[in-house]
Amino acid sequence: MFRLLTACWSRQKTTEEKQRNVTIIVIGLDNSGKSRLIEAFQRLIPSKMHKEMRPTQTTLLLDDYQVSIYDLTGDVKGREKWSSYYAQAHGLIFVVDSSDIARIQEVKIILTRIMFDKRVSGKPILILANKQDKKNALLPCDIIEYLLLERLVNETRSMCRVEPCSTIKRIPKRQQKPIVVGLRWLLAAIGDQYSELYTRQQIPNMSISTSKNIRGCGERCLSDSLPNRVRHSNRQHFDKRQHMEHRQHVEQRHFEKRQHFEARQRLIQRSLDARPLKPILQKDGFRIRPKKNMSVTFALDVIMEEGECSRKIGAPTISKPCSSQCYDTKTPDPSVDVSLFKAHKPKKRIETWDTEEMFLEDPREETFHSCD
């Protein structure tokens, strides 16, 4: 008797050890048939119900798995809470209304966003093309083409399967067989990478919980715990503060560089500006004295030979001063006005100095006047 009880206990222990707990979330747009799908699961697969079980959670026993299925709302508010379940789910079931062609683009956008989420990437996904009993329902091949599933699977490395189904009650059970076939495929895909998916779960950080309100009240699933929210909020504030400090530091460096560049430009401009001449210049006996606000043209009273001209500004024209000895020619007749036969020779002029006005003072000027 003791051996029989021991054998029964060991067999029960082995069976319990073989069973794996799997968490699956059912998502999709509103009116896609998620509620009917859960009811079909309960009709076709034995369910393990508990007294504390909430209306949105269903526990099923299939093969060697104890499956906890969570039905999430598909309205706009419900979609905001989907991401709270991605980390804990081993796999996903996405329900598509194959008869609603007008919303297929919306389905494509939402499914792409879900599959590219880092918490979902790599996890198996079962897509159920629901409402195949209607006339205008899309075939699975059309859904694959519209949703670009081949590209999504290759880029996200997530296994995916499209299964046509219909969840209405009036059809025979054998026509609802694709639902069970799809669920078995999903569990097999989870079992192949169960250890990896188990490590990706964040059970200590977050626990899945559902609202006590009945279906239709809008708030079906609320799973964020307060400590995690506070921790996440503090992390966001810290990241923002780090970003602001880094940005201020970069702006300060740019301002200092701009100030240095402007100071250097002013210094270069100042060095390139024309500098005024010295107040008094003296060279070879000539004295140049500047005067303000006047443009002066210089003229020499000394008559120069033709072709004899110095292009250098300020170069003196040297002439011998007159002595007491005079070189007279023939004395003209006093009755004849000699000035009529003399050609007037203009005075030589030197170039104008535009920088400053200057007067030329020749120390030999008195000698020239004495000769006159």
Swiss-Prot record:
Indicate the segments annotated as coiled coil, or none if absent.
Answer: none
Keyword Metal-binding in the entry? The reply is no
Q: Which organism is it from?
A: Mus musculus (Mouse)
UniProt protein name: ADP-ribosylation factor-like protein 13A
NCBIfam families linked to this entry: small_GTP
Which InterPro entries does this UniProt record tie to the protein? Answer: Ciliary_GTPase, P-loop_NTPase, Small_GTP-bd, Small_GTPase_ARF/SAR
Q: Does the keyword GTP-binding apply?
A: yes
Q: Which UniProt keywords apply?
A: GTP-binding, Nucleotide-binding
The UniProt entry's sequence similarity note says: Belongs to the small GTPase superfamily.
Q: Which SMART domains match?
A: ARF, SAR
Q: Give me the residues that bind GTP, please.
A: 28-35, 71-75, 130-133
List the Gene Ontology MF annotations in alphabetical order: GTP binding; GTPase activity
